[in-house]
């Protein structure tokens, strides 16, 4: 690239896509770039360039050379129009889509649509219902799809080489799927969904994407492109995923010119240690703390949690402090300092905390760790630094932490009483790279129905309007996992009571901003109550960039609540909950999911049940209960009734005649105990078989719900 044009590109960090003059200037700039450089490369953006960017920590530390906008389209409730109008917090987030189109006799819902050059960088899909759909990608204004996915399951995306790291999960449907494979397009993209079953179900989805300046030469995704990238896709997947389990390794090669700064010290309450690094244009490539304590201070205990929360890490670059966070949160773990793994940080849950963000500086760097806990901490630090080429795009690493207690959460049915909580507001120029939400939930229900709303540079409507905390953090609600870019290090209880932690770090879906980034979360849940929230945000920015409203020592010194040992729910005595066990056998087409029921009156064992759907008459599901003595037991079943529920027959140990139950009701309600009779176990086991036998004429479906079973000795 000609030096003159390179300098022009690097010195134009503040594009305004809504300003005609600036758009015209950018168009001229890229026309010139095309003349002097793209004649050889043809495309500036390809799947290959984006995949390589995903593993370049150096590029992540810089403002984008190509000034794209980072945006999101989702299934959020379309009644949410403005904060000064009703329904700003409306929660029918699985109903939203752009429009319905008819094409060649098909009805297709438009989920995503963009014009001009861009690239989809992340897709998240989740549903309680059938995944029997077809997703179609239409590129560059064409009438025929350029790519099809034969399911509401991104594991079937159809590109060879995709593995964990670029696609999650990689083996089976867990009610949610996620893909990070970039899908670029030169002149627009539209994604539609065709339902292949008449079943009415909610579809939650998120599309993160980049919007490039007009005229940017982008190679559109196609079968030809897909056939070209398997080796690079596999290499990228491996680089992302295999790096998650690594902390400091003295045998590793961290690059030419790397230096390891190692120091050990002890800190009592109120003491701090300063670490000064080599001066000059360098960058920290790895920062690890190994905290060793008295043998009585064991990982997983409240005392250990307090210690890790009370060790405060601050980092100053070139005379300006840009990092302030508790050590547990700096590692992406949150309260308790549980194990966390991602592309950017690692914690073993036992005292080793490792940050792998690249942290450049021009002149000097000072790291300080302060102990505010009542416990002595023996700490070993390993810091790896390397030379860094500083240019006009280079940015400093920033981290900020805040905590607020007693925040009011309201049920989604009373959404008009909801409020937004400011997760973070960042001023200056920078690139938003990720965050951690760590909290204590005082309710016995899911608290995270609230959507994220991210506005960039004072835009009139959020460019990121989400569908709930679980979707933002790629969490399907019930299965904990940790991936290169998202994870759930902690969940104390199945109903989300107590401590919970979620992290998300951003790669191609990072968000550049020139003046301000404002991030709010709605405080919406399944039950009225309170939560204690703390947020840790990670971004790269100019030296003067900062987060407003950050917390300090006063919130650290407030301490932590003890880990709860019991959830405040209505437990049915000696009950075995169907959501806590797996069926031993079922019909192939019958599906099941755990479903929260706290929005409905009635008493379920743990305010949830196992909903079975997709079945037809004759389909069944079986459960086995073992470990019983050779004596008589009384068996009682608790179920759910609703307007779309069918008729079932209940068998114990496969007798000839079972007990029939009509599960239809005009409203969602919990049944009382259903007496199944008195039985002796066979070889110490009871086998319960539930068979679908039809439906009430008034019912609109054939679902059924199982709460729990009581097996009481006589």
Predicted regions and their residues:
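Short regulatory "switch" loops immediately downstream of catalytic or recognition motifs
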Residues: 1, 290-297, 690-694
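Bacterial Sec-dependent N-terminal signal peptides
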Residues: 1-40
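Intrinsically disordered, low-complexity segments enriched in Ser/Pro/Gly/Ala and basic residues
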Residues: 10-11, 26, 30, 36, ...
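Extracytoplasmic
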Residues: 451-456, 466, 557-714
């Amino acid at each position: 690239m000609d030096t003159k044009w390179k300098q022009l590109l690097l010195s134009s960090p503040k594009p305004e896509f809504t300003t005609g003059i600036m758009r015209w200037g950018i168009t001229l700039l890229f026309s010139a770039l095309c003349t002097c450089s793209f004649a050889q490369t043809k495309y500036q953006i390809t799947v290959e360039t984006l995949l390589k960017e995903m593993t370049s920590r150096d590029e992540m530390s810089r403002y984008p050379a190509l000034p794209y906008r980072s945006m999101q389209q989702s299934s959020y409730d379309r009644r949410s129009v403005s904060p000064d109008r009703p329904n700003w917090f409306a929660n029918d987030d699985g109903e939203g889509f752009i429009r319905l189109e008819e094409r060649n006799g098909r009805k297709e819902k438009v989920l995503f649509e963009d014009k001009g050059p861009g690239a989809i960088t992340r897709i998240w899909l989740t549903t309680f219902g059938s995944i029997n759909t077809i997703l179609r990608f239409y590129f560059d204004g064409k009438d025929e799809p350029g790519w099809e996915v034969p399911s509401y399951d991104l594991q079937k995306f159809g590109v060879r080489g995709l593995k964990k790291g670029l696609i999650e999960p990689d083996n089976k449907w867990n009610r949610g799927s996620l893909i990070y494979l970039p899908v670029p397009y030169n002149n627009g993209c539209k994604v539609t969904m065709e339902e292949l079953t008449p079943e009415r179900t909610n579809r939650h989805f998120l599309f993160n994407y980049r919007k490039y300046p007009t005229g940017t030469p982008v190679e559109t995704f196609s079968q030809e492109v897909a056939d070209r990238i398997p080796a690079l896709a596999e290499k990228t997947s491996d680089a992302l995923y295999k790096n998650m389990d690594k902390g400091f390794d003295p045998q590793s090669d961290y690059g030419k010119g790397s230096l390891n700064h190692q120091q050990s010290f002890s800190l009592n309450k109120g003491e701090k240690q300063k670490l000064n690094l080599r001066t000059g244009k360098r960058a920290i490539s790895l920062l690890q703390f190994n905290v060793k304590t008295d043998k009585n201070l064991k990982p997983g205990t409240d005392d250990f949690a307090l210690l890790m929360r009370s060790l405060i890490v601050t980092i100053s670059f070139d005379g300006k402090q840009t990092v302030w966070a508790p050590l547990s949160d700096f590692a992406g773990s949150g309260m308790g300092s549980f194990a966390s793994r991602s592309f950017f940080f690692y914690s073993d849950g036992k005292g080793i905390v490792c940050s792998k963000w690249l942290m450049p500086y021009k002149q000097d760097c000072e790291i300080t760790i302060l102990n505010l806990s009542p416990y002595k901490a023996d700490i070993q630090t390993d810091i790896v630094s390397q030379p860094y080429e500083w240019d006009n795009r280079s940015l400093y690493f920033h981290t900020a932490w805040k905590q607020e207690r007693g925040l009011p959460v309201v049920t989604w049915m009373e959404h008009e009483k909801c409020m937004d909580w400011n997760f973070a507001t960042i001023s200056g120029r920078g690139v938003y790279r990720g965050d951690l939400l760590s909290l204590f939930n005082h309710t016995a229900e899911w608290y995270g129905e609230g959507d994220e709303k991210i506005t960039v540079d004072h835009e009139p409507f959020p460019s990121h309007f989400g569908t709930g905390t679980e979707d933002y953090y790629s969490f399907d609600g019930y299965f904990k996992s940790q991936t290169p870019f998202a994870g759930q290090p902690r969940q104390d209880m199945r109903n989300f009571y107590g401590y919970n932690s979620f992290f998300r770090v951003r790669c191609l879906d990072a968000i550049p901003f020139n003046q301000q980034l404002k991030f709010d979360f709605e405080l919406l849940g399944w039950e009225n109550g309170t939560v204690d929230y703390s947020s840790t945000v990670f971004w790269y920015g100019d030296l003067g960039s900062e987060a407003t409203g950050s917390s300090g020592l006063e919130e650290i010194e407030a301490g932590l609540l003890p880990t709860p040992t019991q959830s405040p729910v209505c437990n049915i005595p000696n009950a075995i909950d169907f959501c806590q066990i797996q069926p031993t056998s079922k019909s192939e087409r019958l599906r099941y999911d755990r479903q929260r029921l706290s929005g409905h009156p009635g008493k379920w064992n743990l305010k949830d049940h196992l909903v079975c759907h997709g079945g037809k008459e004759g389909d069944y599901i079986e459960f086995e209960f073992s470990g019983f003595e050779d004596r008589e037991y009384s068996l009682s079943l608790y179920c759910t009734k609703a307007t779309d529920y069918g008729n079932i027959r209940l068998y114990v140990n496969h007798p000839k005649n079972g007990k029939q139950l009509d599960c239809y009701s005009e409203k969602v309600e919990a049944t009382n105990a259903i007496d199944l009779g008195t039985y002796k176990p066979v070889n110490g086991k009871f086998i319960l078989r539930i068979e679908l036998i039809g439906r009430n004429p008034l019912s609109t479906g054939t679902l059924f719900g199982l709460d729990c079973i009581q097996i009481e000795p006589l």
